[in-house]
Amino acid sequence: MQIETKLLSGALGAEIKGIDLTDVSDENFNKINSLLLEHKVIFFRDQPLTAEQHIALAEKFGPLETHAYVKGLENYPEIVRIIKAEDEKNQWGENWHSDVSYNFKPTKAVILKSIKIPPVGVETCFSNMELAWETLDKKIKDKIKDKKAVHSSLGAEFFLENYKKMEGNKKKKL
C-alpha cells in the first residue's frame, strides 16, 4: 500500500495512512521516523496495537522510559493508562502542562493510543518550539539565548544545548 500524508496545519502535524503499525519493517520505520522529524507530530488512525506491539514500535525509536510519577502497567511499566471513571472528579492534566519536560535529555517521541475519547474536555495540543524559535524576533533571541530554565518538577535544568543533542535533530544550529 502507498503511504499517504495529509498535512494538518502549517506549523506541525500530519496524518499518515498506508502503514500497518502492528509489525513495522525497518524500511517503514525509517519512513515513519523521517515523517516525525519533518512534521513533529504524526497521527495514524485505526491501528489496533497490542501492548507488545506498542512496546515493539516504541523501542524502534530508542530506549524506553518509565514515568517518574505514574506507575505503568504491571507487565509493561513503560505504558501508562490514563483512565477516568464517569464518577471520578480529578482531571488528568486539566491545566496546561508539558509531559516529562523535566527530563535532562528531551524525550524523542511519545506514542499515544486513544481507545475511547469523551466528546468534550480532553483537548491535547502540540507546539512546534523549533518554529517558535526560528520565528522569534532577533532581539529577543539575543536576550534569551544564553539563559536557562529550571523545571520545578525535578529541578532539571534545560539548556538549548540539550535540544541540539536530541537524536535525529538536523537543526543543530539554533
Language-model regions, residue ranges each:
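Non-heme Fe(II) oxygenase catalytic core, chiefly the N-lobe of the double-stranded beta-helix
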Residues: 1-174
